[in-house]
Swiss-Prot record:
Similarity comment: Belongs to the MELT/VEPH family.
Occurrences of domain PH (ranges): 716-819
Subcellular location: Cell membrane
Domain notes: The PH domain is required for membrane targeting.
GO cellular component, one term: plasma membrane
Positions of the UniProt region annotated as Disordered: 458-505
Amino acid composition bias (Basic and acidic residues), ranges on this chain: 492-502
Function of the molecule: Interacts with TGF-beta receptor type-1 (TGFBR1) and inhibits dissociation of activated SMAD2 from TGFBR1, impeding its nuclear accumulation and resulting in impaired TGF-beta signaling. May also affect FOXO, Hippo and Wnt signaling.
One of the GO biological process terms: negative regulation of SMAD protein signal transduction
Chief place of localization: membrane
Protein name: Ventricular zone-expressed PH domain-containing protein homolog 1
Organism: Homo sapiens
Pfam families linked: PH
Subunit composition and interactions: Interacts with TGFBR1.
Amino acid sequence: MHQLFRLVLGQKDLSRAGDLFSLDDSEIEDSLTEALEQIKIISSSSDYQTNNNDQAVVEICITRITTAIRETESIEKHAKALVGLWDSCLEHNLRPFGKDEDTPHAKIASDIMSCILQNYNRPPVMALAIPIAVKFLHRGNKELCRNMSNYLSLAAITKADLLADHTEVIVKSILQGNTMLLRVLPAVYEKQPQPINRHLTELLALMSQLEQPEQYHLLRLLHVAAKKKQLEVVQKCIPFLIGHLKDSTHNDIILNILIEIAVYEPVALNSFLPMLKEIGERFPYLTGQMARIYGAVGHVDEERARSCLTYLVSQLANMEHSFHHILLLEIKSITDTFSSILGPQSRDIFRMSNSFTAIAKLLTRQLENTKAGSGRRKISTEIEFPEKLEETKLIVTENEDHEKLQVKIQAFEDKINAGSNTPGSIRRYSLGQVSKEERKNIRFNRSKSLAFHTMLTKGVGSDDGEDENRGDIPASISLSEIDPLGQGNDKLPFKTDTERSQLGESSVSYPNIIHIDSENLSETVKENSQEETPETTASPIEYQDKLYLHLKKNLSKVKAYAMEIGKKIPVPDQCTIEDTVRSCVAKLFFTCSLKGHYCLYSKSSFILISQEPQPWIQIMFLFQQSLFPEPLSIQSHSVQFLRALWEKTQAGGAHSFETAMMESTFPQQKDLDQVQLHLEEVRFFDVFGFSETAGAWQCFMCNNPEKATVVNQDGQPLIEGKLKEKQVRWKFIKRWKTRYFTLAGNQLLFQKGKSKDDPDDCPIELSKVQSVKAVAKKRRDRSLPRAFEIFTDNKTYVFKAKDEKNAEEWLQCINVAVAQAKERESREVTTYL
């Protein structure tokens, strides 16, 4: 042991203790273990708790030792001696004397804990420390327990198996009020499920007492437990989960757990279907998840299949959500399993209808017919299914109030020669019998029918026609064949391509801001946009319509304005209004118009929550009018829908929709500035940009195809360089670390430096990133002018770039990579479905 250590510790000389800091770290590094053993002897003496001199000497020496260990990176060499001193503290009183007054041994334990457990990423050190660490959880010192819980949570992230043997102790600590340790349980459950299962009922009872993050970790635990497929756990979980579905904070996570259970134990959810239906009606954005649960239960037997189909079909006709493709897949899966429900014509139902509403009506009628035992296959007086394969054609008849869709069955089997009996040949022959105009506007393919209806009602069109002659249903209703903006690769959003003969490309495409009942809207698409006015045919009533007259007078200005503003502010594909405690908010969905090979938003959407819905509604109204050559009237279905949205947001005494649109046709500049500022704050422009060439808003990858091919090569980094990192969740870690980061693939990785403190491998998984934001201006000071944050489900990171420009580059690249990772997940889900 170094001479000065021997003097200070041997004689307990407080006057010389400060001189230890004048020594170089390397000079005393070999003496640290021996010094720790000497401190253990001093602190274990009977009079230590009352001897202030000894306490001061020990505190100074421990501070010097832990500093030297950190600077010389020799924690593994001295870990055994540190843990030995730490363990000796358990033999003494650790409860505080009074408020904020720790005992002498609690101070030692706290200092050593910080030194040891900051090395949570070093398994050899943790193997020695964790058995001792968990003992401190029950020693009555709340501050020590809280800090210990933080460190154990860190250890669980990197080395959960070391904590698994202590699961029982951890669970008991949680039940005694140390709920911070809930974040550890999902990590240790895989190794030690039984101790958690034994106390699961007690853990669930804590839910109402927990903070939101802790509730989330408890639900994560249930999700992990559900995957283990243990019946006892399922029986405890389901009533608890159903009971908390009304909480909008977590109902999305809860439904994911129920979906997991439904895969292997659907019968357990059968009795809860009425309650799930009620929740689905209350929260329409959960419809997609509800559909998967109903779909799973519907596979149990035919009786349950019929019951579940009734709900699924009713939701298929509902235009207040955007999950129709999932509903169709679940309906198709059930009817394929129990083919007797719809009979041999089930395939025709999915292929012959041009709208979700029409399909729903056909299915409803057929379900009623089969339930009543009717053997006839007549669906309605207007739509009838033949015994043999037949084709349809659309005949549009005009009414003075609206245009109505009729489907006429055209039998032609006897016209087919013996050499053309395949379904593909029959379709080609049928198309050859209709006029040139009909041939351009009609395709008897399921995906084209879906795209056709949705383009008029929700802005969804066909992407291509490569599977036009396929007969299998799953391929023809695949999401990959639907273009949410109804555009081909070279279409302009504000124009009609009159040269295209494809159904999805010959129509005017516009975003999904309007839900229109297909029965009240013509589905014939003319070749020329000047003829395409299904909503704007003038009637005598319209000439008394003030909104119609106002728009007629200002039509050219409205179109010019919409064209110009469309380059600065994107128009959402879908808009819903949701009530909050204080007011209404608009939930806006944006997708890419091109949907190229590496598109970031072909299957997913960028979702924006706006506290100011009315400017968005006004922007959508102007854009809607720009799509038609004639003025819209107040009776137009699109206007009716927008008016309904407006009324939901309308304050008492405020202007009605038509009055507001007439008095202030164009949004005020301050409102537009606020909209743009909000888009910037949520980093919208990192992942979207207006393409002058295409005349449409496209994602980063579609706007930069030359970068997309490079970025998507395996291992090719999107950006790399040095950043300073700080983990802010644990306030006691205050150091910034400069590391070399690489953003590539689905991860943000950093290069392990010379410091042994750096973990070997702890990348940030981009698919788990919830948001990426610049540090809010109100939080910025001179030390954080270029900082940004990354939020995951269980951690927050803060980074500093070399300057603000570099920070912006990192922000954009990370946002692009996160969108790419989530899009990849969406594609995998779609493929699975």
